């Protein structure tokens, strides 16, 4: 395996390579490659979002995060339909995330909830056909981030420009990596497979309805950044009940541990370092092999 090929491994693959090393020298080499991969990934993400913020305004840095997330995910993930139609869908998803998230913010909570339901229906029914691909963790999350960090006026015009550039970049990367894949399905087949008796359709409807309802309730209760409640709901809604119950139990423990860690860092670190707590978290994610 070449150095470049080893850099392409995910965390699990890298850790298995380290674990199966035959000699100490070989293990140290694989550890060094693994650490280097994490370092350049974090550095690339930081530089990408920084450049996006410079070009389109600091208030649109979250849009840079969404674009970066889409590029990194959809260079490998796909929609299991014709590559050309998938690329068009991806562009449509960017329009949906940018326009509908802004529109919902301008409306009362209950009416905004209906807009969110319609927007998520498009994303989930057409973009999250295979739950094992976890496309909802990209598309729905991206929508909710833009919804929670909405902008207006000139800043929104800059967001439109930034997301348009992001859509072009993502579509180019996506089509380049997936144009040789062969799928018999087309968009119409995704709609035809809607079946209220299937586990997948029930899961999709749960995502589409429950997430906006949770956000609406949080907004009616005057909670700040209500979209985080929606993200929490989205992340635990899984197709199988046993998996959902397992994740909820893990999430309770994880949230408590996360709050404690953040509080400790907040009081131990000097205030100039606060802005880098997210980067520290990103490095921690780089060492993770699974998501619970």
Q: Locations of the language-model features?
A:
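Alpha-helical transmembrane segments and their membrane-interface boundaries
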Residues: 1-137, 141-292
